[in-house]
Amino acid sequence: MARHEIGFRQACTCVLALWKLRVGVEAYYLAQVASGLDEYYTGGGEARGRWMGGGVAGLGLTGEVAPSDLRAVLAGLAPDTGLTPNGTTLSAHPRRVPGFDLTFSVPKSVSVLFGLGDRLVQHAVVEGCEAALAETLGWLEREACFVRRGTNKASNRQVWGERWGTRRMVANGFVAASFRHRTSRAGDPHLHWHVLVANLAQGIDGRWTALDGTAVYTAKRTAGVIFQTAMRRELTRRLGVDWGPIRQDSADIAGIPARVLREFSQRSTQIAEWLDNAGLSGPAATDAAILATRQRKQIAVDFAALETAWHARADALGWGPAELEQLLATTVAPAAEGYVIDEVTWHGGVRQVTSRMVGFDDWLTWLLDARVTAHDGAFTRFDLTQAIAATLPASTPIEVVEATVQRALASAAVIPIGDHWHDRGIVHASCRLIPDDRALRYTSRSLLAVEARLLAQLAAGIDVGVGVLDPESVEAAIAGSTLGADQAEAVRALTGAGDRVAVMVGRAGTGKTHTFGTLRTVYQAAGYSVIGLAPSARAARELADGSGIVSTTIARHLVDDARSTPPPSWWLMRPGWPASAIWLLSSIT
């Protein structure tokens, strides 16, 4: 059962999916549109698509999406002209990408609230989510709406000289059509929006060309976090709902029982069961499970009948209209928590670990250590934006998130690493070329301090006679093994160096785990305990299976270590403690 719960959580937390559109795919979205408002509520059609984005005005598009207009912009044409927006004939390109489908999904609890709520509740949910969607698309336009200028053709290199190569140019906004859908392929409430972004944008030089799609892909996860943050704020403001903890970028409405969420998550259950039966895990396996269990989506769906069935299923679980009404009646919107930009009133996520108010610098240090660099020593501006958006109170507007990011990057706690000018830059409205800091990587001052302490300890542990074995016993073990010449040399080096920490580096498949098996043999024969450590449970199992070493995860080791007095494994870094064990760390990079 626990494995199914994990699969359910993993399958439900993709808040923003991004796909390249195929030629002619717009027919799928247009076919699901209802003929009118009455059919939307009583029949099977979905809401009509609506134009979004700063680029639609340049094409004279507004309001509801007309099928002919959508077909035109996805083909790279201006509506009703048969020509490109530049007034030219479209050049045929066999691999042209019509656009991108940005699919924004809400947490299952929000879909359940929409599916079981009355018309007023449904309207409030849709209104709040669409406000968040518009805010997120605006953020994406500021951060990831670019066209390319220049050329990478080798034949033009001498002609163009220093101007050779492509550069990003700021565009005037996306040409996008938003379609709202209410159900999953399994017939459960699943509120989501398909935002079809045409591969067409106008640069600030006035010329219409294809988008720089790589920028959108880079910003995808951060945009998903921005959407979830804005959605929580909007639904709290409209309906007074409170939220549970944020896990994997998403949070559910507090008060809706887990059994109800599971009942209306048939797709997630199907995916989890497929993974369980296949014995697989990870993103690639999840993608395979999604495709393997995918049903053909019904276009003609009786939404009124579905609503009746949803209410019956919820009633059977003891969570009907009375419980929903009580949830909305007793949930009160919390007052805004302190996050004033120019004052020392920072609280945010720190309230989860302390009750005291803190200054911005202390708050930022906590955020960097606990949320940003806990699993990766370097981060980008987008990574920092995700952490700040997910940590500040639900009432925080996006402008405050962006201002907080800028203040954090200017803080002494954040250290840029690498070259500011490694990218060719972005052409802005002033026609000046400025650096693109989206790809710039940063680290934290506190992490550099930890690194400096670690390096000092490593230096102090060089050639101190720790773990040195009798060369004859080592040679005997090598002779009785199937090690190659380079593996045998690694065993000699590791058992004869005398350093507190010794490192063996090799590509995947070069036999590092097999070499560890021989190290286990010689060290155990010399009276040492040999224990393996790995960053994940899967890596620990592979280390144990391949080397015969009893292995665990680094996280589990740290928990167990903290309960020991003194922690026995710290002899590696504490010269005064006995060298009675050998700890082998596998796949740590």
Regions found by a protein language model. Give the residues of each.
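Intrinsically disordered, flexible peripheral segments
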Residues: 1-375, 380-389, 403-406, 417-424
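Basic, gly/Ser/Thr/Pro-rich low-complexity segments located predominantly at protein N termini
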Residues: 29, 54, 211, 514-516, ...
